[in-house]
A protein has these predicted regions:
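Conserved ABC ATPase signature
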Residues: 109, 134-138, 142
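Catalytic Walker B motif of ABC-type/P-loop ATPase nucleotide-binding domains
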Residues: 159-163, 168
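ABC ATPase nucleotide-binding domains
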Residues: 228-273
């Protein structure tokens, strides 16, 4: 379980996060959503101590992260962040094996079990064919899958992900998020795509200008009356055949959808990015 209460943070004296709260119960997938600059990534970074909040508390399974040693924290939290291309001058195998470091002693060498876990993680994200490549030579989407594999190899009890679907095509966007749900690991994930959030998250936290606007179930948060003032765009909520909510988006400059004929270009779905 991850519990954050009253979390605030400022950059150069400018508040970017104010009294944010978040609860991710055991096995839940909680999505952080909101426009660019709303504080999603800042909140996520405080959860794994990449940023120290000016105020507030963060607990993982009831223990304050401030009292946990780095190695212990790495066993509890696996993180997928948006890393610069080519930052890791390693092979794909070595990159994924980094996820096993929290489980090794100071002088302990990697075992066959560690190697098998890393290989399985690559297979889970559809990247087993990249095993002999250099990480720096991969495309953006390939790098993203390898970084997700590294987090999976860590076998932590909690997973934190910042835009894990970046650079991925539609197929792998759904494959990766479906995999995350199947893992049953407590997960907090930053997502821009609201329809992906609707399909794969158990609950959502909506941020805007550094504050939590609302949080709750998919049905609670993904309502036009809630989202339109935040995103500044017209929304229509539909329901897919499997019962999952789906949102259609239109610019506020366009007339109300009822004034258009079916098949017009204004009826084409556009994702909020």
């Amino acid at each position: 379980m991850i519990l954050a209460t009253g979390v605030s943070h400022a950059y150069s004296g400018v508040d970017v996060l104010r009294d944010a709260a978040l609860t991710a119960a055991h096995g839940e997938v909680i999505g952080l959503i909101g426009p660019n600059g709303s504080g999603k990534t800042t909140l996520l970074r405080t959860l794994y101590r990449a940023l120290t909040p000016d105020r507030g508390t963060i607990r993982v399974d009831g223990v304050s992260i401030d009292s946990v040693r780095p190695r212990e924290l790495s066993r509890a939290l696996a993180v997928v962040v948006q890393e610069p291309a080519g930052e890791l001058p390693l092979s794909v195998t070595d990159t994924v094996m980094l996820g096993r470091i929290p489980h090794l002693g100071t002088w302990q060498r990697q075992s066959q079990r560690d190697i098998d876990i890393a290989a399985e993680a690559l297979d889970q994200v559809g990247a087993e064919h990249l095993v002999d490549r250099d990480f720096g030579d991969l495309s953006g989407g390939e790098k993203q899958r390898v970084l997700i594999a590294r987090a999976l190899a860590q076998q932590a009890t909690h997973l934190l992900m910042d835009e894990p679907t970046n650079h991925l095509d539609i197929h792998f966007q759904h494959e990766i998020l479906a995999l995350v749900r199947q893992l049953g690991v407590t997960t907090v994930v930053v997502l821009h795509d609201l329809n992906l959030a609707a399909r794969y998250c158990d609950g959502l936290v909506l941020l805007d200008r550094g504050e939590v606007v609302t949080s709750g179930t998919i049905d609670d948060v993904l309502q036009p009356a809630v989202l339109e003032p935040v995103y500044g765009i017209r929304m229509q909520r539909l329901v897919a055949e499997d019962g999952c909510p789906q949102l259609l988006f239109r610019s506020l400059r366009e007339p109300h959808p009822g004034t258009h004929t079916h098949g017009s270009r204004e009826h084409v779905e556009a994702r909020v990015r």
